[in-house]
């Protein structure tokens, strides 16, 4: 059994997310977070011979699984890289508009459960945390050079950790004596500086989340890909996003709201909302969360939220089209 296959992964909101795409047999779809291919395989089962599925992932282990799938199914195209390169990657594959795009954000179970990746404080391993281990600075490398203020801001903003300043100060003091290069070392520093304990949560949880999000630019990539998808969706095409914490869900929620709902008009306005131009997105249903049965089978699904939007015939504001070029 390969390293890519040794860690069990249960796809969250599998049917709900793929149902939300309303897959057409001859459609072109994007799975922006392939992982181990749970969503992708269900999409493929609903595509006909003329359909196409493009999958993205940063993780070399996930890409190995995706490439194996692509060898046996010519409808699949594989992109090794972050989904922030959405439009550039599609251009390179000769693809214009798409019928739907799905994103299952955050970290996957295989990444958490593979102790060697350095994502989890449950294992003593090198402090890496990169989703793409072939490029970029590891968590240990960043912690070794970051200023106390930068450490504080990352832990506070991305981990919503109220003891961020104490933790940052302790990290700087400890690294002056010896490198903080393993998950256990970082977890111990955090535990010594978090004064209160949250029920059912390790004191290192928020700090590890914060460093991981920063190292992988997770929130920036979410903010970057959404306008690109909006520009590439055909009329009637669907965007489905599964988020696992409030920071990324807030980005998705605010984006969809901005492009699906007009700002309230002042009472003195001489125009009615019904007379305003159609906006480029419309919200499809309510945000969905896993049911009790799914949470019982997979406790990691507890915090998942699925939001869905559909492309309308409404024009896309020029400023949104310009923003996409920043990541091309």
Swiss-Prot record:
Residues involved in S-adenosyl-L-methionine binding: 37-39, 57, 83, 104, 111
Catalytic activity: cytidine(1402) in 16S rRNA + S-adenosyl-L-methionine = N(4)-methylcytidine(1402) in 16S rRNA + S-adenosyl-L-homocysteine + H(+)
E.C. number(s) listed in UniProt: 2.1.1.199
Listed Pfam families: Methyltransf_5 (PF01795)
Molecular functions (GO terms): rRNA (cytosine-N4-)-methyltransferase activity
Subcellular location field: Cytoplasm
Keywords of this entry: Cytoplasm, Methyltransferase, rRNA processing, S-adenosyl-L-methionine, Transferase
Coiled-coil zones: none
GO biological-process terms attached to the record: rRNA base methylation
Group of enzyme by EC: transferase
Database matches in InterPro entries: RsmH, SAM-dep_MeTrfase_MraW_recog, SAM-dependent_MTases_sf
Disulfide bonds: none
Source taxon at top rank: Bacteria
Recorded family membership: Belongs to the methyltransferase superfamily. RsmH family.
Protein name: Ribosomal RNA small subunit methyltransferase H
Organism of derivation: Neisseria meningitidis serogroup B (strain ATCC BAA-335 / MC58)
The organism's taxonomic lineage, starting at the top: Bacteria, Pseudomonadati, Pseudomonadota, Betaproteobacteria, Neisseriales
């Amino acid at each position: 059994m390969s390293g890519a296959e040794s860690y069990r992964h249960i796809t969250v909101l599998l049917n709900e997310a793929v149902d939300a795409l309303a897959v057409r047999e001859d459609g072109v779809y994007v799975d922006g977070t392939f992982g181990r291919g749970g969503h992708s395989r269900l999409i493929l089962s609903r595509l006909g011979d003329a359909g196409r599925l493009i999958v993205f992932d940063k993780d070399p282990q996930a890409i190995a699984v995706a490439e194996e799938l692509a060898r046996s199914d010519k409808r699949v195209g594989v992109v090794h890289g972050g989904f922030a390169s959405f439009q550039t990657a599609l251009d390179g594959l000769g693809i214009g508009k798409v019928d739907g795009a799905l994103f299952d954000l955050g970290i996957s179970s295989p990444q958490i459960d593979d102790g060697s990746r350095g994502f989890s404080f449950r294992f003593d391993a090198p402090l890496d945390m990169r989703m793409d281990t072939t490029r970029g600075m590891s968590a240990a490398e960043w912690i070794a050079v970051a200023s106390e203020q930068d450490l504080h801001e990352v832990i506070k903003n991305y981990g919503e950790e109220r003891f961020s300043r104490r933790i940052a100060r302790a990290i700087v003091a400890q690294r002056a004596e010896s490198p903080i290069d393993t998950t256990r070392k970082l977890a111990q520093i955090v535990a010594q500086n978090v004064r209160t304990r949250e029920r059912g949560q390790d004191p290192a949880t928020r700090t590890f989340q914060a460093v991981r999000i920063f190292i992988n630019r997770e929130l920036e990539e979410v903010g970057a890909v959404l306008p690109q998808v909006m520009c590439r969706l055909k009329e009637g095409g669907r965007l489905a996003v599964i988020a696992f914490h409030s920071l990324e869900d807030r980005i998705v929620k605010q984006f969809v709201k901005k492009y699906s709902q007009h700002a309230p008009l002042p009472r003195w306005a001489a125009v009615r909302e019904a007379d305003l131009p159609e906006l480029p997105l419309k919200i499809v249903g309510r945000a969905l969360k896993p049911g009790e049965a799914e949470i019982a089978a997979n406790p990691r699904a507890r915090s998942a939220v699925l939001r869905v939007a559909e492309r309308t015939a409404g024009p896309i504001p020029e400023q949104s089209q310009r923003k996409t070029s920043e990541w091309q």
